[in-house]
Structure formats: C-alpha cells, structure tokens
From Swiss-Prot:
<feature type="domain" description="Protein kinase">
    <location>
        <begin position="126"/>
        <end position="494"/>
    </location>
</feature>
<dbReference type="InterPro" id="IPR010232">
    <property type="entry name" value="UbiB"/>
</dbReference>
<keyword id="KW-0418">Kinase</keyword>
<dbReference type="GO" id="GO:0005524">
    <property type="term" value="F:ATP binding"/>
</dbReference>
<keyword id="KW-0808">Transferase</keyword>
<dbReference type="InterPro" id="IPR045308">
    <property type="entry name" value="UbiB_bact"/>
</dbReference>
<feature type="active site" description="Proton acceptor">
    <location>
        <position position="289"/>
    </location>
</feature>
<dbReference type="GO" id="GO:0010795">
    <property type="term" value="P:regulation of ubiquinone biosynthetic process"/>
</dbReference>
<keyword id="KW-0472">Membrane</keyword>
<keyword id="KW-1003">Cell membrane</keyword>
<dbReference type="Pfam" id="PF03109">
    <property type="entry name" value="ABC1"/>
</dbReference>
<keyword id="KW-1133">Transmembrane helix</keyword>
<dbReference type="InterPro" id="IPR004147">
    <property type="entry name" value="ABC1_dom"/>
</dbReference>
<keyword id="KW-0831">Ubiquinone biosynthesis</keyword>
<comment type="function">
    <text>Is probably a protein kinase regulator of UbiI activity which is involved in aerobic coenzyme Q (ubiquinone) biosynthesis.</text>
</comment>
<dbReference type="InterPro" id="IPR050154">
    <property type="entry name" value="UbiB_kinase"/>
</dbReference>
<comment type="similarity">
    <text>Belongs to the ABC1 family. UbiB subfamily.</text>
</comment>
Length: 533
C-alpha cells in the first residue's frame, strides 16, 4: 500500500509539472506570501519548459484526465460547485468525460461468477462478452436470463478499491494542507468537498444501493407517462453485480433520430422539468446524475414522449423543512421579494441567525436584479440557485450536500430542456407545480396527517417533562446553557404546551365528567400550538 502511495505521488508530481499546474497554484490569491516564495524555489521552475498555449481551465482538465478515473470523477463533481470555482474553470471541468477502455471480458466473467456463486452459463442463456459501455467504476454487458428476459449486467471493475483509497487519501492530504495554510481556503471547506466526493464514490461501488435506488424511483413513477425506470432483477444482484431490464430507447442527445420519429420537443422539454419538480417536492427523492448519458426517450409514443432513466447510483433527498423553504424561496425570488428571500435563508438556518437581514437583502438584490432584465424564458433557474448560493456564501452559508446535488441536477435538466426546445420557459412550467404543492401543504388532509404524527409523540410527554424537571432541580442548572433543540425555527415550548392541551382534551373528553366544550377548546388550542409555524 505504501509503495502504491509513493508511486501515485510521483505520478501526480509529473502531471503537475507537465501541465504547469504549479503556475496555477501560485497564482491563487488565497496563498500566503511565504508559500509563494517557497514555490518559486522549486527546482523544475528554473529549468526551460515548453510554453502551453492553453487556458488555466484546459490545463486543469487535461491534468485530471491524465491522473485517471478517480480524479476525473472528482473534477466532474467539482465542476458542479460553481459557488466555489471561477466560471472559466467550472465550464472547462464540465467537459470531463468519464470514459475509459473496457477491462478484459474474462475478468468481467470471473467477477460475475464469484459474486453470483454460479457459472455464467447457469444464470444466463446468452452473455455478450463485448461490453455495451465502459466507465471508470463499472462496465455493462448485455445478456438474456434463462427465463427469457433481456437484461444488462453491470459489474464493478476489479482491483479498484486500493486505487480509490490511495487517491482519496492524497485528496484529503491536499485539502487539509490548503485549510492549514490559507484562511480563504478554510472558508471554502475543501475537506468537506473531498468528504462529499468520498461518499459519492463509495456509494457508486455498492451496486445493491444503486439497485435499491432504482427500485424506489421505479415505484415512485409506476404507471406514469413521464418517466420509466427499468426493472431490477433482485435474485441476481450482488454488491459488485447489478442485473436490470434492458431498455431500447433513443439517447436524448440524438436530436436527428428524435425528429425523424416526430417527437414533440416542447412536451419533452416540459416533461423533463415536471419530472424534476415531482421528484423533489412530491417524493423528496431525486435522481441526482441526470446527465444526457443517463437519459433516453421511449419510441412508443413520440407525440406524448416518455423519458427513460438509468444509472441511479447517485440520488438526493430533502427534509420537509428544506422542501418548504426551497419552494417559498423560489416563489419569493420570482416575485422579487428579496426581503422574504433573505428572511427565509435566516429562518431556515442556511445562514447564521445573527445575519443582518437588511444587509443580506441588499446583497441578494444587487446580484439578482440584473437577471430580471431578461425575459422570463431566458432566465436560468439553475443560475438563480447558483447566484443565491454564491451570495449566501459571503454571509457564511453552510451549503448542504443535498442542495448542491439539487442545483447540479437542475442545471442538467434545464440545459437539456433548452437544448430540446430553446423557447422553454422553465418558470411558467414550474410555477403552477410549486403553487399547487404549497396549497396541498395546508390542505385538511395534510394537516390531519401532521396532527396524527404529533399525536404519536404524546406518550413521550411525561418522560420529557420528568427529564426537564430533573435538569432544573440540579445544582447550577440555571447557569447551564439551554439544551440545544434541533430545528432553528420550531417553537418547541409552544408545541409542548399544545401537546399537554391535547392530553387534557383526551382526559376531559374520555372522562365525561364535565361538559364537552372545554375538551373542544383544549383540542383546538393544542392543534393550533402544534401546527403553527
């Protein structure tokens, strides 16, 4: 392992020198003066080197490609963090392609047989040794099950884990070094960025997780005309092998074939937007890797086109609170209610509670007003989120990984939609959905569901009260800091009182020792205190 790490370090050093990334690093404004001086004394900087007529973004992209698949995927993820990177570098990194030569079919067959515990001929009536596709983490083969179903078999590359561990270790070393030498780097949280990447790559190595994600997404859109997700054949799925239904669709980027079958491009673009908002707000479970290589279009009904999604290795979800605040933020933004946008960021805990709402409102207005000089159909929804994140970052916003996944997915969907139909007005498509969702949040059915969830907590009230009294009875309890309640915007004291009223209402109502009206008053008061925001 140590020998592998040393060899990898030498390889990284050669690539840095070849693409003159040392120049790029030394130009960083966050670099302290003493490190610039140290960098200027590096031996190779005094030797003649050929001049590269490439932009800094292109040099970084080519270097990551040379360093191999793990660095390529890291660059792809980094390209989505436009709140951290300059636009020219982020745009260049977006061109990184996760394509590598396939590994020998003999190794694929061996790994499949090891995982399934059976010979390939015992499981499949036909297995095509030539892969359909190959990427840095896995490759895909076509096959047919003994029961007759046409399937694809995805298999993880052999001997990948040691390389990943080594590369991730070096990324962490570089991130920690950056945090140690620069306060500006610490503000960008490089260790957190690498940690997010580590989680992503580890998740992609577990094909049972991908199978579970695909099954969930398929169930969410069962019978839907919007999206089809291939069936998972669980009997033949293992941590390193995934067997799914083979789909036959048109790649979403093959515009010529889509035109030939007379696809309704306007409907196709609008359905992409509807799929995104349905996943985020109805299901709180969204496919977070919706780049064109993972999206196909069904050939069945071109006048009512249906998407087909594959590769569910990366998914995202939002809490109920984040869903609510995101929807209200977007609606307030498009109404130019910047005060409300600022207040929502503070209330949600996305920026520190001590943030001055007037200053934050002014910063948002400065960034966003120029955007509204364009017609609504020309406004990028993804860029709106990006600009909000960039502005909030100046106010020490801690951007959650799920929100980054959301912004990346929205940019992909929006870019794809406008490629299919340039006149796509994303706001006109999204606004009715968001407003309907907000209305449903306060519908009697939803309020009853919320009430039932709160009532489930009633049996725990006596223990909560006992714990509180014990804490207050302890010496120095009044000098101790208050307990840290989770959720910055919930009035837990009010909810506790509301729950007590509910218990009282139940006691009065069931005891039947008094008239019924006190129970109704207590019930109404309890419901109000529990459900109020």
């Amino acid at each position: 392992m140590k020998l592998l790490a040393v060899r990898r370090l030498l390889r990284i050093q050669r690539v840095v020198i070849r693409y003159r990334l040392d120049d790029l690093i030394l130009e960083l404004p966050m670099l302290p003066w003493w490190l610039r001086l140290l960098g200027a004394t590096l031996p190779w900087r005094w030797l003649p080197r050929r001049k590269l007529e490439l932009t800094r973004g292109a040099r970084l992209r080519l270097a990551l490609q040379d360093l191999g698949p793990i660095f390529i995927k890291f660059g792809q993820i980094l390209s989505t963090r436009r709140d951290l990177l300059p636009d020219d570098i982020a745009n260049e990194l977006a061109w990184l392609q996760d394509k590598v030569p396939p590994f020998p079919p003999e190794l694929a067959v061996k790994r499949i047989e090891e995982q399934l515990g059976a010979k390939i001929e015992q499981v499949f009536a036909r297995f095509e040794r030539e892969p359909l596709a190959s990427a840095s983490v896995a490759q895909v083969h076509a096959a047919r099950l003994k029961s007759g179903e046409e399937v694809v078999v995805k298999v993880i590359r052999p001997n990948l884990e040691p390389v990943i561990r080594s590369d991730i270790a070096w990324l962490f070393i570089l991130a920690r070094l950056a945090e140690r030498v620069s306060s500006e780097a610490r503000r960008l949280h490089p260790v957190e960025v690498v940690s997010d990447y580590e989680k992503t790559i580890v998740d992609e190595l577990d094909l049972l997780r991908e199978a579970a994600n695909a099954s969930q997404l398929r169930r969410n859109f069962e019978g839907s005309p919007l999206l089809y997700v291939p069936q998972v054949y669980w009997d033949w799925c293992r941590p390193k092998v995934l067997v799914m239904e083979r789909i036959y669709g048109i790649p979403v980027t093959d515009l010529e074939t889509l035109r030939d079958q007379r696809t309704d491009f306007k409907a196709l673009a609008e359905r992409g937007v509807e799929i995104f908002f349905t996943q985020v707000f109805r299901d709180s479970f969204f496919h977070a890797d919706m780049h064109p290589g993972n999206i196909f279009v069904s050939t069945r009904a071109p006048w009512s086109p249906q998407y087909i999604a594959v590769d569910c290795g990366i998914v995202g979800s939002l809490t109920d609170e984040d869903q609510d605040y995101l929807a209200r933020n977007l609606i307030a933004f498009f109404k130019r209610d910047y005060r409300k946008v600022a207040q929502l960021h503070i209330d949600s805990g996305w920026v520190p509670a001590e943030t001055k709402v007037n200053d934050f409102e002014a910063a948002i207005r400065t960034v966003c007003e120029p955007i509204f000089e364009k017609p609504l159909k020309d406004i990028s929804f993804g860029q709106v989120l990006l600009r909000l994140f960039q502005t909030a970052r100046r106010f020490n916003m801690e951007i959650q990984p799920q929100l980054v996944l959301l912004q990346k997915t929205l940019l992909n969907i929006e870019g794809l939609g406008r490629q299919l139909y340039p006149e796509l007005d994303l706001w006109a498509t999204a606004q009715p959905f968001l407003e309907r969702w907000m209305r449903e949040r306060v519908s009697p059915k939803q309020l009853l569901r919320n009430f039932q969830q709160q009532v489930e907590q009633v049996p725990h009230l006596s223990q909560m009260a006992r714990d509180t009294l014990e804490r207050l009875s302890q010496p120095h309890a009044h000098n101790a800091p208050p307990p840290e309640w989770k959720g910055s915007r919930h009035d837990w004291l009010g909810r506790l009182v509301g729950a007590v009223l509910l218990v009282g209402a139940a006691e009065v109502g069931l005891g039947q020792q008094l008239e019924a009206w006190p129970a109704w008053v207590m019930l109404a008061g309890g419901v109000f205190l529990i459900l109020r925001r």
